């Protein structure tokens, strides 16, 4: 009887024990493995592995036995917790996969967005610069020779004040209006594409509220599995050494769970902050181009109807457009941060009661588990070549690489996102270009409201604003080209290293699929042998 019980114990140990510390052979962090459903394991009636205490020596057989020693002492093995370990890890894989897919679905930029937006905004800046230069040449012609000589009807030489050619000034306004219309349409197109991607994400179950509910559900399932694991550990009557190993395993599992939840929160907040920032950029871009185009239409109407005072209201609209150019990058960033804070509040329940853990804490718990397993006197159940050990090594490598590459991923994402913006959507260039348009607006207001009947003075003042904004428009043209070249270079450089955001996330999903397959394979083998 004793030999049969001992043989059964060793057979089950060899089948189920997870060599959590065999990772010392591969030098990676430790992740406990999962896959067998608890209901298919211990809860389904499988007997725990036991070790029966040895019989008393023959010399002491005739001595009276105490009540506690009258029956053999049954102790469970830490290997009986393996089904729970695998099941918890399967849930953690599900959590990480959901977080990655959430980021992908809520942060779609597309390969050609940068080029589309560049073409629309470059057309805007180029057409505006061309129209302003055409106007500036005509205004300067009048400034250079303010009075022209002519012969009156009596043949006497006389002089008269020269006036700018209204047809030429109007012709200079037309490309500006067309450019601003193209710019607004380009921003509207990108905004519409964002709305479409948002619709797709919500339809796939990755909207903000459904996503939070899904993550909370996964968290609850993991917590339930932890509770079942703790109950099984207590019922197994583990030895002191095995109980310490079980607690160390649980610490590692909880480290990974905490890190997975924190990563989802980070992805959620980051994706929503950038989407709010980008959408507000497009909305403000539409606003500034629309206001500027209406201001130019007002000036064009004044030229056609010989009403120079229309330059005053037109200047007000031009001034407003310039202020919007200055404020767009600042207001968009503030709006993005405000949206991020709103989502952080709604995500507070995801991390409520969860101890903050990081890679450093995971490594500490791994090292402690390594020491405990190394101190075991019975190492016959540990096989570095077992399915569980290999899966565990894969999990550990994945977790280590994911955390080490997180900063790299964020940097790459920032570089790619920068390439989808126009020059004026950066604070420095936006302030400079917006300032030149504000100058044009002020000059137009002075010319229209104060010097409407003094054409030469009004023209001279208008010319100063025209030259200023033409300079700003050429700055926009040049910086847009710089940003496009920089974006293509970054994509080429990162793509060769497989560090583009979508490449990194795609590789992580493939790794998770391989891990999940390995876990389920281990579970299937265990079920067949049982």
Where on the chain are the PLM-derived regions?
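Classical Sec-dependent N-terminal signal peptides that target proteins to the secretory pathway
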Residues: 1-44
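Intrinsically disordered terminal tails
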Residues: 24, 457-460
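Terminal, compositionally biased segments
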Residues: 36-42, 47-51, 55-57, 62-63, ...
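Leu/Val/Ala/Ile-rich N-terminal alpha-helices, chiefly Sec-type signal peptides and the beginnings
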Residues: 47-165, 169-176, 190, 250-268, ...
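Cytosolic/matrix-facing juxtamembrane and C-terminal tails of multi-pass cellular membrane proteins
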Residues: 66-82, 86, 90-91, 95, ...
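Membrane-active amphipathic alpha-helices enriched in small hydrophobic residues
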Residues: 114-140, 166-199, 273-301, 309-338, ...
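Interhelical loop segments of eukaryotic multi-pass membrane proteins
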Residues: 142-152, 202-209, 304-310, 344-348
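Extended amphipathic alpha-helical interaction segments
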Residues: 228-300, 312, 316-319, 325-329, ...
């Amino acid at each position: 009887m004793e030999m049969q019980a001992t043989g059964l114990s060793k057979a089950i140990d060899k089948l189920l024990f997870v060599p959590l510390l065999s990772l010392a052979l591969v030098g990676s962090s430790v992740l406990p493995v999962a896959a067998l459903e608890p209901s298919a394991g211990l809860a389904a009636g499988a007997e725990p592995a036991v070790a029966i205490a040895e019989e008393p020596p023959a010399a002491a057989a005739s001595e009276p036995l105490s009540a506690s020693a009258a029956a053999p002492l049954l102790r469970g093995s830490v290997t009986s917790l393996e089904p729970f370990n695998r099941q918890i890890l399967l849930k953690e894989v599900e959590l990480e996969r959901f977080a990655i897919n959430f980021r992908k679905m809520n942060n779609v930029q597309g390969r050609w967005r940068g080029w589309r937006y560049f073409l629309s905004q470059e057309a805007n800046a180029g057409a505006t610069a061309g129209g302003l230069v055409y106007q500036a040449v005509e205004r300067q012609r009048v400034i250079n020779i303010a009075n022209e000589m002519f012969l009156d009807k009596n043949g006497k030489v006389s002089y008269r004040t020269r006036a700018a050619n209204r047809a030429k000034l109007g012709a200079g306004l037309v490309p500006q209006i067309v450019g601003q219309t193209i710019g607004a349409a380009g921003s509207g197109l990108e905004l519409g594409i964002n709305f479409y991607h948002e619709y797709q994400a919500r339809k796939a179950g990755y909207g903000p509220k459904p996503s939070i509910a899904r993550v909370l559900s996964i968290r609850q399932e993991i917590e339930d599995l932890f509770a079942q694991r703790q109950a099984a550990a207590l019922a197994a009557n583990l030895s002191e050494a095995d109980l310490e190993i079980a607690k160390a395993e649980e610490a590692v599992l909880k480290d990974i769970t905490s890190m997975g939840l924190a990563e989802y929160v980070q992805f959620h907040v980051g994706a929503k902050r950038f989407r709010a920032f980008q959408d507000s950029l497009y909305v403000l871009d539409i606003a500034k181009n629309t206001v500027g185009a209406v201001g130019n239409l007002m000036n064009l109407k004044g030229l056609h109807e010989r009403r120079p005072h229309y330059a005053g209201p037109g200047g007000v609209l031009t001034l407003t457009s310039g202020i919007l150019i200055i404020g767009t990058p600042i207001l968009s960033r503030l709006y993005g941060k405000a949206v991020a804070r709103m989502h952080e509040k709604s995500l507070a329940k995801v991390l409520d009661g969860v101890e903050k853990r990081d890679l450093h804490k995971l490594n500490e718990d791994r090292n402690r588990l390594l020491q405990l397993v190394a101190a075991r006197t019975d190492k016959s159940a540990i096989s570095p070549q077992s399915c569980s050990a290999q899966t565990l090594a894969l999990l550990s490598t994945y977790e280590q690489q994911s955390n080490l590459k997180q900063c790299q991923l964020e940097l790459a994402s920032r570089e790619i996102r920068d390439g989808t913006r126009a020059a004026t959507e950066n604070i420095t260039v936006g302030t400079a270009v917006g300032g030149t348009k504000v100058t044009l607006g002020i000059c137009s207001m002075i010319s229209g409201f104060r010097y409407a009947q003094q054409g030469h003075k009004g023209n001279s003042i208008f010319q100063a604003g025209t030259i200023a904004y033409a300079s700003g428009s050429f700055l926009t043209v040049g910086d847009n080209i710089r940003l496009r070249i920089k974006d293509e270079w970054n994509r080429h450089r990162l793509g060769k290293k497989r560090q583009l955001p979508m490449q990194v996330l795609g590789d992580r999903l493939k790794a998770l699929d391989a891990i999940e397959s390995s876990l389920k394979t281990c579970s299937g083998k265990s079920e067949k042998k049982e």
